[in-house]
Amino acid sequence: MCNTFECLSVERLTDELRSRIRAFALRIAAHPVEIIAGVPETLQHLAGRSHHLILMTKGNPAEQTSKVERSGLKGYFAAVEVVAEKNAKAYHTVAEKYALDTDVTWMIGNSPRSDVNPALEAGLHAVFVPHDMTWVLEHEELGAPKKAGQRLLRLDRFTDLTSHF
């Protein structure tokens, strides 16, 4: 956060300001992870049906790994992948790493920009589950399937996955 401040601010980064920014960052990092209602039960259902679940998220690896650990949801996932950017190349890389068959692999997410559209571009099927708290930077038009047989589902709630998978 201090580096970002230095890049974006005209104000000089003093020792006092650096200390305040670090204290703020520690409060953010320690904030409890808020789980959307029904997510643990839905993940349990999917894992119980022998679906191979891989969590792919973007951001700082240490921060994202900590969030996953603190969420209590890590046990539902066969793997957790933290990438710098969720784009078609990243989805291809993860699919290759885990030898995923794109004809039967689904991406589930709330962001057209970072989840649905790049997954479709990478040849995966996609499920779009909109959420009110999705960052505005993640908004864009939903793409369309790119190949024959590819599917895009839109569900109202994460828990609706249990009716489809």
Give the location of each predicted region.
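A metal-dependent, Asp-based hydrolase signature
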Residues: 1-27, 45
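Asp-based, Mg2+/Mn2+-dependent phosphohydrolase catalytic module
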Residues: 40, 44-47, 51-52, 60-165
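Long amphipathic N-terminal alpha/beta scaffold segment
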Residues: 23, 28-39
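Short, conserved alpha-helical segments within structured domains
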Residues: 17-21, 38, 86-87
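Functional surface patches built around histidine and acidic residues
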Residues: 8-9, 26-31, 70, 89-90, ...
